[in-house]
């Protein structure tokens, strides 16, 4: 897996393709174990969750070992934490257990250009994410709720995969990045090495 996890990004991991490959490996009786090379800075929380689930299904049938490349951060770590064993280079950048949302705001630009927009909508959230205006308080609250739910799920997945408590994961999470060597000391990685 090389790139960010996404269901749509041309430059990232297309989660559906990865999931299809993982399912084929699960069904292939000649495959006795899977080494999954992860070199990803992260990506979509949704795509990462889908791949995480596919890795969990695969490891019910055969051992899954993750070998981390230069980085396995955020969504890259999300995917990795489902493995039976995680191997990282001493300098691998990993962890980054955190989630953020980004809604562009082009209002300043449209104001400068003298552009204005009329919006007709069915309810107050119908144009949520409209870049022609800033978010209002209700939208910020809603987005924060989604971010918090996603973060809680990410922490839970890491706790389950690493056989640690959510509290232990939260102490080393908060979006922080660790080297492979430091990650091994805190339990995010099992073995230092490479392929």
Language-model-detected regions and their locations in the chain:
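Alpha-helix initiation and N-capping motif
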Residues: 103-106, 166, 195
């Amino acid at each position: 897996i090389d790139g960010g996890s996404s269901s749509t990004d041309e430059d990232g991991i297309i989660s559906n393709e990865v999931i299809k490959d993982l399912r084929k490996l699960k069904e292939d009786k000649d495959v006795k174990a899977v080494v999954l090379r992860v070199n990803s800075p992260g990506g979509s929380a949704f795509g990462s969750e889908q791949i995480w689930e596919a890795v969990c299904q695969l490891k019910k049938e055969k051992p899954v070992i993750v070998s981390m490349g230069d980085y396995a951060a955020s969504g890259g770590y999300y995917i990795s934490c489902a493995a039976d064993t995680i191997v990282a280079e001493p300098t691998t950048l990993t962890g980054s257990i955190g989630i953020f949302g980004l809604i562009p705001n082009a209002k300043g630009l449209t104001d400068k250009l003298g552009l204005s927009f009329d919006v007709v909508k069915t309810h107050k959230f119908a144009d949520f994410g409209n870049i022609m205006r800033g978010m209002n308080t209700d939208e910020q609250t809603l987005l924060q709720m989604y971010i918090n739910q996603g973060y809680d799920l990410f922490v839970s997945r890491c706790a389950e995969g690493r056989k640690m408590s959510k509290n232990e994961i939260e102490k080393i999470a908060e979006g922080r990045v660790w080297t492979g060597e430091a990650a091994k000391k805190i339990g995010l990685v099992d073995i230092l090495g490479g392929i």
